[in-house]
UniProtKB/Swiss-Prot annotation:
Disulfide bonds join C11-C91, C44-C49, C97-C300, C177-C209. This is Peroxidase E5. Belongs to the peroxidase family. Classical plant (class III) peroxidase subfamily. CDD domains: secretory_peroxidase. It catalyses: 2 a phenolic donor + H2O2 = 2 a phenolic radical donor + 2 H2O. Its EC number is 1.11.1.7.
Length: 306
């Protein structure tokens, strides 16, 4: 039902309008591309890509922004608002917030050095948010490989390449120390660091995230090319330099079927880019609202007045 040319007649400028906002925002905020990609991911894992993550709390539901995986970390909402405002001027009541977030993710990846792909479009926006589901459906940075696979399979992403390629979104962006500290000092209650951590990387991370330090300090996922979308993430995993446990598990879980994919993507950028684009399309197609389902929100933060 979704198709890349969905807006070719009704809003042909949609891609340019979204791109111009991202280009402008990147000048002052080099993190914004990674932040937008993460918003899309956190949207799609909770009842499909329906822009439910963008809704603020109302009298009928609590916002997903308050859920543990999003609170104090999901960001970029104001940038989506900028895109929506510009699109409402150019093509009123035409482009859904769900499609804005999907297109913005693709352009964010492309502008950061990553692949391009034709984004299937025609999603509509949900009229409710799913706070409880956001707390349970999103993968945790402390997950083992088995838990990660289950979280992905639960939403319909059941190929090893879905998990390994989408994890490569951590080739840019940052995480807070509070998601890393346990690995550095007391991994799984052992009073020792995670044995998969490269010793020099461990020393670097301990400097950035001291034992009783400020958990809100931000650390780059990829120390080599922190704002570039490339395959360095996988090389880092092979060298024991994955920042969060759930990423390192892809390579360090003995006998895992994800290891050959980490090796492949590390040695071949085109293989990674192709797999990432494919997995993004698969994720973007999860349970979309189409036709007369949902609505086209006029303000991405609130449901249209009835």
């Amino acid at each position: 039902q979704l198709r890349p040319d969905f807006y070719s007649r009704t809003c042909p400028s949609v891609f340019n309008i979204i791109k111009n906002v991202i280009v402008d925002e990147l000048q002052t905020d080099p993190r914004i591309a990674a932040s937008i990609l993460r918003l899309h991911f956190h949207d799609c894992f909770v009842r499909g890509c329906d822009a439910s993550i963008l809704l603020d709390t109302s009298k009928s539901f609590r916002t997903e922004k308050d859920a543990a995986p999003n609170v104090n970390s999901a960001r970029g909402f104001n940038v989506i608002d900028r895109m929506k405002t510009a699109l409402e001027r150019a093509c009123p009541r035409t482009v859904s917030c769900a499609d804005i977030l999907t297109i913005a993710s693709q352009i964010s990846v492309l502008l950061s050095g990553g692949p391009s792909w034709a984004v299937p479009l025609g999603r509509r926006d949900s009229v409710e948010a799913f706070f409880d589901l956001a707390n349970t459906a999103l993968p945790s940075p402390f997950f083992t490989l088995a838990q990660l696979k289950k979280a992905f399979a639960d939403v319909g992403l059941n190929r090893p390449s879905d998990l390994v390629a989408l994890s490569g979104g951590h080739t840019f962006g940052r995480a807070r120390c509070l998601f890393v500290t346990a690995r550095l000092y007391n991994f799984n209650g052992t009073n020792r660091p995670d044995p998969t951590l490269n010793p020099s990387y461990l020393a670097d991370l301990r400097r950035l995230c001291p034992r009783n330090g400020n958990g809100t300090v931000l650390v780059n996922f990829d120390v080599m090319t922190p704002n570039t979308f490339d395959n360095q993430f996988y090389t880092n995993l092979r060298n024991g330099k994955g920042l969060i446990q759930s990423d390192q598990e892809l390579f360090s879980t003995p006998g895992a079927d994800t290891i050959p994919l980490v090796n492949l993507y590390s040695s071949n950028t085109l293989s990674f880019f192709g797999a990432f684009a494919d997995a993004m399309i698969r994720m973007g197609n999860l349970r979309p609202l189409t036709g007369t389902q949902g609505e086209i929100r006029q303000n991405c933060r609130v449901v249209n007045s009835r």
